[in-house]
Structure formats: C-alpha cells, structure tokens
C-alpha cells in the first residue's frame, strides 16, 4: 500500500481497551470516531487497533478477535475486563491487557507510530516496550491520569507503595512519549508542574461533539420534558452520578431555592455509585424541587439536553488538572447556558469565560450556585444570549474535524522523525495547534 507517488502509507496503531462496537459513549466512542475519520479522510494512513473483546458495561456476546472495519484492522484480545470493583483486580487485569498488547505488537508488522490511551492505565507499558525493542515512537493520549485520580478520590494513599510505584511508571511513560495529548490546559499544567514534562511536548486536543446530531430547539419541544411533566426553569444534570461529580452542591442550592424560587427544578438523569446516597438525601431533606430520573439511551440524548433551560456540570476539586468532563461539548451544542461547578483554573472555567456561555461556580459553595441559578431563571434574555454563545463555541472549538486535524498533523510530524531524532534536540520538528485550544 502506498500514499500516492510511490510513497508507502504511514502505519499507525492505536492501543486502547475499549473500542468499536462499544456504544457506551465516553472515550471509547471518541477514539472510534477519531480512527474512523482518519481512515476515511486520509488515505495516506493505514490505521490498526489493538483492543479487547470486552464491553465496558455489558458482558454479552463478544466481538470477533479479528475484524476489518472498512479498512481499519482491529485485533481484539481475549483478556479480563479491567473495570473490576477491587483495586487489586483492576491492576492485574490492566497489566494483563498491557502484556497481551505487547505480545500482539511484537508479532505484528512494524509501525511508524503507536497511539496509546489511558484505558487501562497500564496500556502505555505496551507502547514503551515496543519503543525499547524496535525504536517505534509513541504518542500518549491522556484522557484520565492515574494514579493521580485514584489518589484524589481517596482510593489510594499518596504515600502508599502502589501509588508511588504507579507514579514512577507514569513518569517514565510520559517522558518516553514523543508527544503527549491532553484534553485541557489544566491537564497540561498538571503534567508540567507534577511530572516535569516540557510544555512543548504537550498538545491540547479537546474532545468533540456532534453539532449535527445535537441541534438547538426550545425546551417546550422536548419529548423528555413533556413525558416527565417538567415545568418552569429546569436545570439539568445528565451523566454519571458518582463521587467525582460533587452533586451535593446541587442539593444545597436546591434547598436554598425550594421556597424562594418554586419555578426552579433540578433534574438529575443518570446512574452511578452515588445515586442511592443522593436519592436518600433528596428524600431526607424534602427536596421536592429535585427529580431523579434514569439515564436515557444514546438516541434520546439530544432530546434530553433540549429539556433543559440551563445545563449543569461539575467536577471534584480533587480531580482538577486530572480530567475534563467529556459531556461539556454536548452541553454547549444544545445551546443552553452551562453552570459549571469547577475550580477556577479548570478548562471548563476558561472556556466559559472566553465564550461567555455560562457561569463558573466555586465547588463547595451552594449559596453561590443558588445565586447563579436564580439569576438565570429571572433573566430570559441572558439565558438566550449565553445559549447562543455556547452553540457557537461548540461549532468552532469542539468539532471532530478540528481535533482530527490536530491528530493528523501530530501523526505525520512524529512518524517522519527518525528514531531518536527528537531526543537529540529536545523539541519536536513542528507543532500544530488549532485556534481555541490554547
């Protein structure tokens, strides 16, 4: 296979645990869309994928171990799922995936570049091993940073042996990468300050949204809103109800607004390990203005977002610089103001300020959150203006084409670097950053 003019195609391999036909959203869906776009739009690339035969949330019939997905060769490994309840089991499963991926890489033809994600956290070990054996460069796609997240959530002690061991390896993988991509400026800053990584080696590539699938429409036209009898000013949270989302803040704001602003309601549509605790608090505090609903299937997600007058997103301060909520672009595409309970330095805070598309609230300040909600509920013009700005931000800054173009530039620049060339200069030969990512 050649790239035209007799030049061979660049061979690229992505390593990630979950991939097409995974339909649970999040990072697996993003990476599947990215690979599909690159393969369709760039015939000079030959893209392979090494993944598992598992689905993140289900354990039904597993896909075939080998599949040609319209030109993308997918090799699926028969390994245990890494999303186990036990930390020890997750670690062992992740190491098993990394070992199997390493063996698969060494048995495959040579690649010009390897792309490796952070699921499972041990996946970069496979890319690092291939670099050591064959001098193949790799780009490290950091969506979630471990062990930092586990330490932030209290699952690991910062000074414990497991965390220190994992951090030592993380340091090696980051510094061994030809380039590292992150989802936001806050993550870039964390890698610079906590891992000593040179800023010039980090590329900010945001996750994207489908602005053609999520279209603005008035809340009153939402079937979800009609089915559930939602009236007045609806603040919607749609997503995982877990420990990292700090939904206690929204309950505190609901308690403050329950009597003074009866037209305001808070809708939490989702599931997760904190749902029962949140439901208990709603009942115990008699928060009649809070409605807990089940998550919706993917095809109903745009209609769910349309049910809101304002959207809500949050992230624990303990995860500042370690992750960026993947739903943010979707909320912007729905043309609703976004109320973000996030630290001041987070990527969401930067975008909201730059695009004037919502309100940033300090975590742990329910009074501030209640004030922001009341202000939006009483100012229809402000809501419409922020919603229009949100839609423009989604269309200009959070598109698949924009992010895929960054990845394509990254791939072509790194794959053409002779083994060891970047180490000699300490800088990559070129750096392409789309507008709006800095």
Residue ranges of predicted features:
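Conserved donor-binding/catalytic core segment of Leloir-type glycosyltransferases
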Residues: 227-245, 251-254
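Membrane-proximal helix-turn-helix segments that form the acceptor-binding/catalytic region
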Residues: 125, 129-133, 160-182
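N-terminal subdomain of nucleotide-sugar transferases
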Residues: 1-70, 419, 429-438
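Carbohydrate-associated surface elements
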Residues: 53, 186, 208
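A short, well-ordered alpha-helix in the C-terminal region of glycosyltransferases
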Residues: 368, 375, 382-397, 406
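A short helix/loop element that forms part of the nucleotide-sugar donor recognition site in Leloir-type
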Residues: 62-67, 215-228, 425
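Nucleotide-activated donor-binding/catalytic signature segment of Leloir-type glycosyltransferases, i.e.
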Residues: 270, 275-302
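Nucleotide-sugar-dependent
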Residues: 245, 290, 297-306, 311-332, ...
């Amino acid at each position: 296979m050649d790239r035209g003019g007799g030049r061979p195609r660049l061979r690229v391999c992505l390593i990630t645990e979950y991939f097409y036909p995974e339909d649970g959203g999040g990072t697996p869906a993003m990476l599947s869309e990215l690979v599909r776009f690159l393969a369709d739009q760039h015939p000079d690339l030959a893209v392979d994928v090494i993944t598992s035969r598992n689905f993140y949330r289900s354990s039904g019939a597993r896909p075939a171990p080998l599949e040609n997905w319209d030109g993308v060769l997918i090799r699926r490994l028969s390994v245990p799922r890494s999303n186990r309840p036990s930390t020890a089991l997750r670690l062992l499963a992740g190491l098993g995936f990394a070992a199997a991926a390493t063996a698969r890489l060494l048995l495959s033809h040579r690649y010009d570049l390897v792309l490796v994600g952070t699921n499972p956290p041990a996946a970069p070990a496979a890319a690092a091993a291939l670099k050591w054996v064959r001098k193949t460069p790799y780009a490290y796609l950091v969506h979630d940073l471990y062990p930092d997240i586990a330490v932030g959530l209290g699952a690991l002690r910062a000074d414990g042996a497991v965390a220190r061991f994992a951090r030592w390896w993380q340091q090696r993988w980051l510094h061994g990468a030809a380039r590292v991509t992150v989802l936001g400026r806050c993550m870039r800053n964390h890698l610079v300050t906590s891992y000593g990584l040179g800023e010039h080696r980090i590329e900010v590539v945001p996750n994207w949204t489908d602005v053609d699938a999520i279209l603005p429409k008035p809340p009153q036209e939402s079937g979800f809103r009609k089915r559930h009898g939602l009236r007045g000013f609806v603040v919607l949270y749609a997503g995982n109800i877990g420990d990292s989302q700090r939904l206690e803040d929204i309950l505190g704001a609901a308690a403050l607004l329950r009597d003074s602003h009866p037209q305001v309601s808070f809708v939490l549509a989702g599931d997760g390990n904190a749902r029962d605790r949140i439901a208990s608090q709603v009942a115990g505090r008699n928060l009649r203005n809070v409605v807990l609903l089940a998550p919706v299937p993917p095809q109903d997600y745009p209609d769910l977002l349309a049910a809101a007058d304002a959207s809500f997103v949050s992230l624990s301060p303990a995860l500042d610089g370690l992750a960026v909520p993947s739903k943010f672009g979707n909320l912007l595409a729905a043309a609703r103001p976004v109320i973000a309970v996030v630290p001041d330095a987070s990527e969401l805070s930067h975008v909201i300020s730059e695009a004037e598309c919502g309100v940033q609230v300090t975590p742990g300040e329910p009074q501030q959150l209640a004030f922001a909600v009341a202000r939006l509920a009483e100012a229809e013009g402000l809501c419409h203006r922020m919603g229009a700005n949100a839609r423009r931000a989604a269309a200009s800054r959070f598109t698949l084409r924009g992010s895929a173009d960054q990845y394509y530039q990254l791939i072509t620049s790194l794959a053409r670097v002779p083994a060891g060339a970047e180490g000699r200069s300490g800088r990559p030969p070129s750096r392409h950053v789309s507008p709006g990512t800095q």
